[in-house]
């Protein structure tokens, strides 16, 4: 399997059950469980490599995009971890603080959701506040990121970043009006941009 592709598909399955508020059909639920088994093992490999590097004196301050995606999926899917997986996840949690300064919008949104699901609301709200600092609002375009004109310098794709932030704001609560404004920007993108990749459409 491929960690990125498996993570992407798992994300769709997790969101699907959340959006429909229904349990997944049995065969799909089995597929999701197998996907998490694979992602757990891949994350564990990375965790062991990090711990080994630290023992050898390397300072690890941030996590890979794949590990951030994994933590986000575990949080969003309310996956229960035990044993070494739980220990690994707790360790990863200690590395999230640096994302406040260095993280892309997707990374900050994911971190906010992870912390929210861990009951660490105060820390999650710091990330939400940081995200809001970058949002601009106009009557015509709604709420959006000013740097969308040149997003790749920010290491992000505009639509997935926008959607990830909406998800984080929804999870934090009390942002309904802002989310509606962000929907307006998305609708404008749909009108002016051809979403010809399945990834953009799915997001």
Question: What positions do the PLM features span?
Answer:
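Large, well-folded core regions of big proteins
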Residues: 1-203
């Amino acid at each position: 399997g491929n960690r990125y592709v498996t993570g992407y598909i798992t994300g769709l399955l997790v969101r699907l059950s959340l959006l429909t508020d229904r349990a997944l059909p049995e065969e799909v639920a089995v597929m999701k469980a197998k996907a998490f088994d694979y992602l757990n093992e891949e994350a564990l490999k990375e965790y062991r490599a990090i711990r080994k590097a630290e023992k050898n004196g390397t300072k690890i301050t941030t996590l890979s995009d794949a590990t951030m995606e994994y933590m986000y999926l575990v949080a969003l899917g309310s996956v229960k971890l035990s044993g070494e997986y739980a220990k690994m996840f707790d360790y990863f949690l200690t590395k999230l603080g640096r994302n406040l300064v260095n993280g892309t919008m997707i990374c900050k949104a994911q971190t906010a959701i992870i912390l929210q699901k861990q009951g660490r609301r105060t820390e999650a709200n710091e990330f939400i506040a940081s995200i809001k600092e970058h949002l601009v609002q106009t009557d015509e375009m709604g709420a959006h990121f000013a740097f969308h004109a040149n997003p790749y310098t920010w290491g992000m794709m505009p639509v997935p970043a926008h959607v990830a932030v909406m998800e984080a704001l929804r999870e934090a609560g009390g942002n309904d009006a802002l989310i509606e404004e962000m929907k307006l920007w998305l609708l404008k993108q749909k009108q002016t941009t051809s979403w010809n990749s399945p990834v953009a459409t799915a997001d």
